[in-house]
Amino acid sequence: MNEQYSALRSNVSMLGKVLGETIKDALGEHILDRVETIRKLSKSSRAGNDADRQELLTTLQNLSNDELLPVARAFSQFLNLANTAEQYHSISPKGEAASNPEVIARTLRKLKNQPDLSEATIKKAVESLSLELVLTAHPTEITRRTLIHKMVEVNTCLKQLDNKDLADYERNQLMRRLRQLIAQSWHTDEIRKQRPSPVDEAKWGFAVVENSLWQGVPNYLRELNEQLEENLGFKLPVDFVPVRFTSWMGGDRDGNPNVTADITRHVLLLSRWKATDLFLKDIQVLVSELSMVEATPELLALVGEEGAAEPYRYLMKNLRSRLMTTQAWLEARLKGQKLPKPEGLLTQNEELWEPLYACYQSLQACGMGIIANGDLLDTLRRVKCFGVPLVRIDIRQESTRHTEALGELTRYLGIGDYESWSEADKQAFLIRELNSKRPLLPRNWQPSAETREVLDTCQVIAEAPQGSIAAYVISMAKTPSDVLAVHLLLKEAGIGFAMPVAPLFETLDDLNNANDVMTQLLNIDWYRGLIQGKQMVMIGYSDSAKDAGVMAASWAQYQAQDALIKTCEKAGIELTLFHGRGGSIGRGGAPAHAALLSQPPGSLKGGLRVTEQGEMIRFKYGLPEITVSSLSLYTGAILEANLLPPPEPKESWRRIMDELSVISCDVYRGYVRENKDFVPYFRSATPEQELGKLPLGSRPAKRRPTGGVESLRAIPWIFAWTQNRLMLPAWLGAGTALQKVVEDGKQSELETMCRDWPFFSTRLGMLEMVFAKADLWLAEYYDQRLVAKELWPLGKELRNLLEEDIKVVLAIANDSHLMADLPWIAESIQLRNIYTDPLNVLQAELLHRSRLTEQNGKEPDPRVEQALMVTIAGVAAGMRNTG
């Protein structure tokens, strides 16, 4: 068992040693001794030594203000290094997930062994594979880009050090490079000084494409092709690329006033500029490689006399000059210059594809397939995956913004107030206007700034090259008129094609009404004509969990999807479900394979579209090899879910879920909404107020500046509870509901559900993962240090609940300890706890000092503030997810 982890452990301790040397060089022996003492006490405390636990608390409470920052930074940096070692371990030959690309082979073998699945059926399922990953800049990627680059290089060093045949001088050279990188990280400020702008976030997204996806996607397709050839004797067509990337960075304006129409326009141009930049590098390589002379008559006809001597090079040089022209024009536009479009400007993917594909066909026909299937094939696949836009963007806006804009317009036109009309009147007005030939917007109308912004955004969509914007997502969608309103605003902007408009259902009530809303829409003839048989619906995970607790939310999500799938199937509509999952459990995060197989049967027929958020992007796509691994996992899961769908839940299972849902929602809301002590307890037991000071994302932490838990965004809500290790949003209510159903004599039925129904077993698995990261003594320590005595009983009550919940989940899952079937994750949590515990204790101490200073009306000590930020970032690294 432990053989597998010894390589990981030795890398972690080597990196720790180098970090120790760096700290000693920078700050002297005494600080290193202090850090080492704390580490040893923490290790012993974890092993159950109470005296050492007490000493750990005393030591950290007695640190001077000068020692706070170095100690916090030491443990925080160590966790970043441990995460890097773990990321490397997951792709190293010695590691667990070195077998991830085999996932595809394993899945194909499993499918081939099914007596009722023909190879033709499997092949058809492969051909209809569709995977769209939507990168979002949630304010959760705590680590600065500059440190991420250094960690990627550390990864490269670890990879090279694994080479058995290294000469001594090579090993010494690599160790010297590691020391340099770790020293550079130590001497870099890990906390950003200001919040990133939406454009900075978009650039972060482009960096992921350049550093990882650009190489990772073609590598994944080679892997997929190899497995298909080996297992099914089937080759992927050249133009078959089942994966695409979309981004919310620069397009998501929901509750983020910093994302304006101008920003979106700028990001679209920047994205195209980055695409020309990356394709130019590819084409440069092809210019030097494709020196061949022999070509088909078709290719020779294409290049004419001028290019006959080196036909492939001739085409590549032409393409290169078009890319350079395009890049220069985009650069001028980005600088604000208004230039006419030059001749040869690239705006469509076909213009990139055609010359490349002509070369490919000619090389194949002339017996040079080995050359055609080299760099040229990779570039062709990049054209299909990224193309001229590089990544498409989604626009997301809150439904009330559209309602307010139309209200302002109808009042100006003197035809009443749209906002106060009934739903039936709204629909009648919208359908009438959608069918009308005359424009609705008056020429000389001067709307308010808010309405102007909504109209300008629609204008940007209408002007953007077709294919650069993927969808318009309406958050907090509640009614059919919410969807029709967006179609009308887009029509008024002069959009010439049917843009996918996706309602996002995200509260418990909205999820329960989702099917009704979509049924009404599909009953409108005009609407059916517009969508041409395709509909996208987005399911919100994070807000529903914050609204009703994780058990009720996940059942509502399941039922909404199930009903929508059946409604669309009956209506002959191809449904794409868009999953708005977060990285953490309380926001719907789950290991990809388990999460997909736990969805209702048929949910992946229209492909998978899912958000990849903040810090998860780095864990899943931070390196080309990890990209191959993540895409392979998704591919295997989609094929399996479509060809071996999970069972339809039995009626009795549905009834139990209904019961669990009602009880857990009541318990959850009983605390979060109805207990008068809850909000004051939350504010004092977690760093919620201090989190607002972290310059994390471009988006404010609250939708409205005042208000209680309901106005907090889902991310800071989860983030705060993750920091104090109570992890409350990810379990509150679930265990109590399970306990009640067990007391009603249904334990054996729950055990059957756990064994035979992926939806239910995944839910329990997610609870176990949260329980493994939660920590009762640390949560209690936060209470003792930070919470007023009269609120202590509430904290104790919540911790007792957590303890009971762990027992009931283990009983139903028939496990003696948490994470019994995922030892790799359990190992990883244990490894990091030794370094996370001191950060938690220190954070409670810093919050105590910082709040005391504030109560006494004194100026905050910058050393305390800075160290506090570092502990927040460090605990986030230790928990491997933020919000």
From Swiss-Prot:
Cofactor(s) listed in the protein's UniProt record: Mg(2+)
Job of this protein: Forms oxaloacetate, a four-carbon dicarboxylic acid source for the tricarboxylic acid cycle.
GO biological process: carbon fixation; oxaloacetate metabolic process; tricarboxylic acid cycle
Protein's UniProt name: Phosphoenolpyruvate carboxylase
Entry keyword Nucleotide-binding: no
Listed GO MF terms: magnesium ion binding; phosphoenolpyruvate carboxylase activity
Active site: 138, 546
InterPro entries per UniProt: PEP_COase, PEP_COase_bac/pln-type, PEP_COase_Lys_AS, PEPCASE_His_AS, Pyrv/PenolPyrv_kinase-like_dom
Similarity remark: Belongs to the PEPCase type 1 family.
One Gene Ontology CC term in the entry: cytosol
EC number: 4.1.1.31
Class of enzymatic activity (EC top level): lyase
Catalytic activity: oxaloacetate + phosphate = phosphoenolpyruvate + hydrogencarbonate
Top-level division of the source organism's lineage: Bacteria
Keywords for this protein: Carbon dioxide fixation, Lyase, Magnesium
